[in-house]
Amino acid sequence: MSFPYFISPEQAMRERSELARKGIARGRSVIALAYADGVLFVAENPSRSLQKVSELYDRVGFAAVGRFNEFNNLRSGGIRFADTQGYAYSRRDVTGRQLANVYAQTLGTIFTEQAKPYEVELCVAEVAHYGETKAPELYRITYDGSIADEPHFVVMGGTTEPIATALNESYAENASLEDAVRIAVAALGAGGNGAEPRTLGPSTLEVAILDANRPRRAFRRITGAALEALLPQADTKDDSQDSEGAAEPDA
């Protein structure tokens, strides 16, 4: 007589968590950090079409790591929700906390009820409305629907521990945009598998900001010459030397 296969709920949750964590760790890292004029997003992303960072609404931004199709579905759903709320009520009624709670509820339901959890981790950020003074808000939402309010920065994906350690040592409140980019890029470079820090150039970075000084839509991407001007000069020099000498390592 054969007995039906049984797995305890605790074991099932552990296996789901392990699956999601492994999927998230395979992705390249993303940093979101508060600076003097808003929030800076820096993602290690060589793709120009599959973006990890985007706008959700006027003063709200989004960053994610993990499976692209899964977090892109969440991003699209968040945009639709925000547009509906803003149209039905007021644009000012759409907040980062509201969207973070929606994502937390959605991911929590998927984690407990569906056959496979989403292998994603999200960050929702919000800056003050134009002319107002309020500290940026950063929310981390994990694969199981857990939500945390982070005061200064969020690190997701890849090898987060060395990156978080580097940020704890170098992060400065109310830093300028140039200093914030330098801090974030240096921290990302510390997250490689090798012992030596990596050099990351414009071709491997996706950078955007939520600028509280912009009147309505705070989100802005930084690309091309504008990004090169913000990167440390030493990094730019190293990139040119690498291109003339030995082949660069994989991104």
Curated annotation (Swiss-Prot):
Location of region: Disordered: 230-251
InterPro entries reported for this sequence: Ntn_hydrolases_N, Proteasome_alpha, Proteasome_alpha-type, Proteasome_asu_bac, Proteasome_sua/b
PROSITE patterns in UniProt: PROTEASOME_ALPHA_2
Coiled coil location: none
Compartments, record wording: Cytoplasm
GO biological process terms held by the UniProt record: modification-dependent protein catabolic process; proteasomal protein catabolic process
Means of activity regulation: The formation of the proteasomal ATPase ARC-20S proteasome complex, likely via the docking of the C-termini of ARC into the intersubunit pockets in the alpha-rings, may trigger opening of the gate for substrate entry. Interconversion between the open-gate and close-gate conformations leads to a dynamic regulation of the 20S proteasome proteolysis activity.
GO cellular component terms attached to this protein's record: cytoplasm; proteasome core complex, alpha-subunit complex
Matches recorded under SUPFAM superfamilies: N-terminal nucleophile aminohydrolases (Ntn hydrolases)
Keywords: Cytoplasm, Proteasome
Pathway entry: Protein degradation; proteasomal Pup-dependent pathway
Residue stretches of biased makeup (Acidic residues): 241-251
Alphabetized CDD domains for the sequence: Ntn_hydrolase (cd01901)
Range of residues in the leader sequence: none
Gene Ontology MF: a single term: threonine-type endopeptidase activity
Function description: Component of the proteasome core, a large protease complex with broad specificity involved in protein degradation.
Cited HAMAP family: Proteasome_A_B
Subunit structure, as described in the record: The 20S proteasome core is composed of 14 alpha and 14 beta subunits that assemble into four stacked heptameric rings, resulting in a barrel-shaped structure. The two inner rings, each composed of seven catalytic beta subunits, are sandwiched by two outer rings, each composed of seven alpha subunits. The catalytic chamber with the active sites is on the inside of the barrel. Has a gated structure, the ends of the cylinder being occluded by the N-termini of the alpha-subunits. Is capped by the proteasome-associated ATPase, ARC.
NCBIfam families membership: 20S_bact_alpha (TIGR03691)
Similarity annotation: Belongs to the peptidase T1A family.
Protein name (Swiss-Prot/TrEMBL): Proteasome subunit alpha
Organism annotation: Mycolicibacterium gilvum (strain PYR-GCK) (Mycobacterium gilvum (strain PYR-GCK))
Taxonomic lineage from the root: Bacteria, Bacillati, Actinomycetota, Actinomycetes, Mycobacteriales
